[in-house]
């Protein structure tokens, strides 16, 4: 017959008799077990930095070297100092213009400058008058003969000149927009 002792080991009955007769051993020190870290979705700052350097470290150096090859030699030291925020220098106008022109040349060929939209002369009316208080806006607008809103209203039983509802008690005329030039807000 086997007996299980507190520490989880198996001993036989003859061993148990010897254990009872012998003095108890000194208590063991408990082992400190570090809790296992669960793998997280996000990297720690150190891990992220290492991964970034592995992925982009070489490419970044290549880009910097490529950029430096396009800059004139007299501008190299200035551009490196200007790159640092703490030592921003006011450079000569000619040098800054040269640098801007070189950067424009370095843009990818696929990107094009935006074209300005030309306004047609007849599309904008120049004789717009300032409207006075109480002037009704849109009264001369043509009636809408087709549209989603009109179709929905007709499906509910509406027809021109009648109100909406079972007894045609709703508004017959459209809502009128009236100009209010004063700055008092809504009334």
Curated annotation (Swiss-Prot):
UniProt cross-references to Pfam families, sorted A to Z? G-patch
Region: Disordered; residue ranges are 15-46, 119-145
Superkingdom as given in the UniProt entry = Eukaryota
Q: Where in the cell is it found?
A: Nucleus; Cytoplasm, Cytoskeleton, Microtubule organizing center, Spindle pole body
BP GO annotations: meiotic cell cycle; ribosome biogenesis
What keywords does the record list, in alphabetical order?
Cell cycle, Cytoplasm, Cytoskeleton, Meiosis, Nucleus
Compositionally biased residues, Basic residues: 26-41
**An example Gene Ontology CC term for this record:** cytoplasm
Q: GO MF terms on file?
A: nucleic acid binding
Q: Boundaries of each G-patch domain copy? A: 145-187
Question: What role does this protein play?
Answer: Has a role in meiosis and sporulation. Required for meiotic chromosome segregation.
Q: Which PANTHER family match?
A: G PATCH DOMAIN CONTAINING PROTEIN 2
- Protein name (database record): Meiotically up-regulated protein C1442.13c
Native source species:
Schizosaccharomyces pombe (strain 972 / ATCC 24843) (Fission yeast)
């Amino acid at each position: 017959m086997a007996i299980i002792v507190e520490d989880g080991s198996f001993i036989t009955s003859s061993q148990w008799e010897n254990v009872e007769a012998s003095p108890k051993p000194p208590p063991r020190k408990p082992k400190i077990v570090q809790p296992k870290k669960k793998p997280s979705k996000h990297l720690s700052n150190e891990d992220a930095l290492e991964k970034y350097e592995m992925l982009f470290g070489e490419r970044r150096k290549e880009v910097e070297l490529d950029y430096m090859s396009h800059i004139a030699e007299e501008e190299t030291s200035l551009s490196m100092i200007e790159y640092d925020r703490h030592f921003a220098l006011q450079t000569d106008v000619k040098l800054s213009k040269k640098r801007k022109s070189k950067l424009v040349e370095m843009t990818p060929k696929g990107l094009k400058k935006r074209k300005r939209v030309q306004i047609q002369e007849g599309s904008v009316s120049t004789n717009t008058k300032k409207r006075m208080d109480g002037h009704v806006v849109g009264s001369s607008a043509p009636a809408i003969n087709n549209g989603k809103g009109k179709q929905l209203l007709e499906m509910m039983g509406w027809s021109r000149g009648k109100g909406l509802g079972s007894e045609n008690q709703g508004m017959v005329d459209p809502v009128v927009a009236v100009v209010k030039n004063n700055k008092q807000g809504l009334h």
